[in-house]
Structures are given as structure tokens and as C-alpha cells.
């Protein structure tokens, strides 16, 4: 039954314009039901966002795929994720690159995500409890940065931690949000608007 629902989801993603086969294989390899509450497991393969507690959500599979595809990852890409959340996006990234760094401001979510990733034998992830606005400077610079919550403006620290040629993908805005694609070229930042989106806000600071 799960396999059938997964195949339906993959078909929907292809119909929505996701064509990177390596990415689709990574999505197929990650059991989304493991990243949501048991009571919501029957909705795991619906193309919708779901609550994960602490006022946070696991993103819609299309948005996970769209943002990941925009990063143009190779196996050796150095990747930073801001907002570990449930760990689902992290797991997709871990199937695509050699190592992932991920920052989560809510300690309980970080701990749960770390446990889930370990249970799935995904050991190529470093998680950190901290303020996502600050990135993870000691692990940078990064070839790709993905942000899974929306700041009102692009955090300077994330721009600074982007390597030459690197790509930053994030939602930006408050009441109205758009997905931004940022590439650093010749020490300049080229910003494109991709589409309208709706994410939880990227809050400064960290919670125990």
C-alpha cells in the first residue's frame, strides 16, 4: 500500500515538473511516514504539508523536491540546511550528497530528527542546535544552502557563508512570501524570484 502511494506521489511530482531522476530516487528511498506523527501516517504520501509539533511543519513533497532541484547538487556538494524540522528534507539531501550540515533552533525537534536519521542508517549528517539566522560559519563555506522557513529578508550570514558559484534557496517574506534563488558569482549575489510560497517564519534565536 505504501509503495503504491509512493508511486502516485512520484507521478504527481513528475507532472508538476520535477524531472531529476536522482532526486526522485532519493525521495522514493525516504519513508515519509517515519517523519510524521503516527496519527498522520496515512497522509504521509499526500502532496501536502503536515504539522510536526512546536508550531512547525514538514514541507509539501513538491516544495521539498522543487527547492532541492534548484540547488543543482552533486555528490561532493557542501550543503547547509537551515531548519532541520522533522529531518525529512535532511534525509533527502543525505541521499544526494556525501555530507549534510543542518541547524535547528528547537532542541526537541533537533533531537527527534537526529534519532530518525540514525534509525534510517543515515550517518552522513551533522546536526546542530542553534540560530538558523547565523548559519554554521565554522563548517562553511557551502556550495548549497537551503532554508525551510521564511525570514523577512535574506540573512547576511547565509550570504557570507555561500561559496563562489554557490546557490542559496529560501522563502522570503512575512504575510506574502516568494521563493528566492540566489547565486554568488564574482562576489556578487544574483537573486531571482521563483514562485509564491507559504512557509512558517524563520525565528531568530534558539529554544531549549
UniProtKB/Swiss-Prot annotation:
Query: Keywords in UniProt for this one?
Result: Cytoplasm, Methyltransferase, S-adenosyl-L-methionine, Transferase
Q: Where in the cell is it found?
A: Cytoplasm
Has UniProt tagged this entry with the keyword Secreted?
Answer: no
Look up the record and report any one GO term of the cellular component aspect.
cytoplasm
Biological process per Gene Ontology, one example term? protein modification process
Q: Where is the signal peptide?
A: none
Q: Which NCBIfam families match?
A: pimt (TIGR00080), PRK00312.1 (NF001453)
Q: What protein am I looking at? A: Protein-L-isoaspartate O-methyltransferase
This protein's encoding gene? pcm
Amino acid at each position: 500500500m505504501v509503495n503504491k502511494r509512493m508511486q502516485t506521489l512520484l507521478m504527481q511530482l513528475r507532472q508538476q515538473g520535477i524531472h531529476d531522476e536522482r532526486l526522485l530516487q532519493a525521495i522514493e528511498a525516504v519513508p515519509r511516514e517515519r517523519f510524521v506523527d503516527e496519527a498522520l501516517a496515512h497522509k504521509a504520501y499526500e502532496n501536502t504539508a503536515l504539522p510536526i509539533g512546536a508550531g512547525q511543519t514538514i514541507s509539501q513533497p513538491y516544495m521539498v523536491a522543487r527547492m532541492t532541484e534548484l540547488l543543482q547538487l552533486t555528490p561532493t556538494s557542501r550543503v547547509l540546511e537551515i531548519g532541520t524540522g522533522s529531518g525529512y528534507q535532511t534525509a533527502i539531501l543525505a541521499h544526494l550528497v556525501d555530507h549534510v550540515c543542518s541547524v535547528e533552533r528547537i532542541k526537541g525537534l533537533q533531537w527527534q530528527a537526529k534519532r530518525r536519521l540514525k534509525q534510517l542508517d543515515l550517518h552522513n549528517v551533522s546536526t546542530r542546535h542553534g540560530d538558523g539566522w547565523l548559519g554554521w560559519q565554522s563548517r562553511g563555506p557551502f556550495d548549497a544552502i537551503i532554508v525551510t522557513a521564511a525570514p523577512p529578508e535574506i540573512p547576511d550570514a547565509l550570504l557570507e557563508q555561500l561559496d563562489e558559484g554557490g546557490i542559496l534557496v529560501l522563502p522570503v517574506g512575512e504575510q506574502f512570501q516568494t521563493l528566492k534563488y540566489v547565486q554568488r558569482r564574482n562576489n556578487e549575489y544574483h537573486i531571482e524570484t521563483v514562485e509564491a510560497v507559504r512557509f512558517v517564519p524563520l525565528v531568530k534565536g534558539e529554544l531549549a
